[in-house]
Amino acid sequence: MREEALQAIQEAPDLPALQAVKTRYLGKSGLVTRELGALGKLPPEERKRRGAELNALRQAIDAALTEREAVLKRAALDARLASEAIDVTLPGLSLPAGGLHPISRVYDDLIRIFERMGYAVVEGPEVEDEHHNFEALNVPWYHPARDLQDTFWLEDGRLLRTHTSPMQVRYMVDHEPPLKVVVRGKVYRYEATDATHESMFHQLEGLVVGDGISMADLKGTVAELARGLYGPSAKVRFQPSYYPFVEPGADFAVWWDNPRGESKWLELGGCGMVHPNVFRAVDDLREAAGKPRVYEGKTGFAFGLGPERIAMLKYGIPDIRYFYANDPRVIGQFRGELG
């Protein structure tokens, strides 16, 4: 039986076959188990001798089973590793890469420029009241911007802000001069949508207030902005313009070489010295809130520009509507670009 059992163990091709051999010899009804159960029927001397033989046989079978099991497990593992082996020379599976929206990229570029100049960066509410959006910014009731055809009005008398300037008022109410701040966010205009106009777009607006702030400071700031966007040799032009919340007001443009080899002045935004009526309105709001009047007699400048226009020119996007169409063919071109 010993030779038969050991041979069967060595010839077992896999673990299930080895388990069958174990059951055949050492199971509850196995050959060795039955022999051990029959020892009680033998005379004492023969029982002792036969018992020693069967115990030695069982130990030999157990040892052979353990050794063969280790061999078969190792062989099974080797076979599995061979079948599941990774060829490290094959190219990996690339995961889809995300990227910043072009508007976000331009915003980040602008914010970095102003943070280098020491500006705080804030955002404000998109739903505004009429006073902060118009009256506090020296936009009287008869001004065309307050026409129902130009503004999204809500049923409760509030509106979707038409510019980010209301946050300038809110910031001055909460902070005393001197201050330097830029405001970023969405604004809304009730106008027809076309390649260059949307009813929702973005603005970045800046405000500086202190003692002796002049138009020269404003020009220096805009020039630094232009250099940050278009390089150290960027040229800036100012032209007189009208905005109710600044006096004097101006539009600013940079000399731009487009990808087609053309050079021209590119208008970026508007700016000017903060109108005294705005400072007066801010102090009125501060006084109503129990705060001291600190802005009358101060000077400051403000400026604003649209990230969409910069992004359209920078990336050659011909239609502003592409930014918000959720077209993967457009946005997918910016995968992996994280600023």
Curated annotation (Swiss-Prot):
E.C. number(s) listed in UniProt: 6.1.1.20
Molecular function terms, GO-annotated: ATP binding; magnesium ion binding; phenylalanine-tRNA ligase activity; tRNA binding
Compartments, as annotated in UniProt: Cytoplasm
Binding site for Mg(2+): E247
Quaternary state and interactors: Tetramer of two alpha and two beta subunits.
UniProt family annotation: Belongs to the class-II aminoacyl-tRNA synthetase family. Phe-tRNA synthetase alpha subunit type 1 subfamily.
Name of the featured protein: Phenylalanine--tRNA ligase alpha subunit
Lineage of source species: Bacteria, Thermotogati, Deinococcota, Deinococci, Deinococcales
Gene, per the UniProt record: pheS
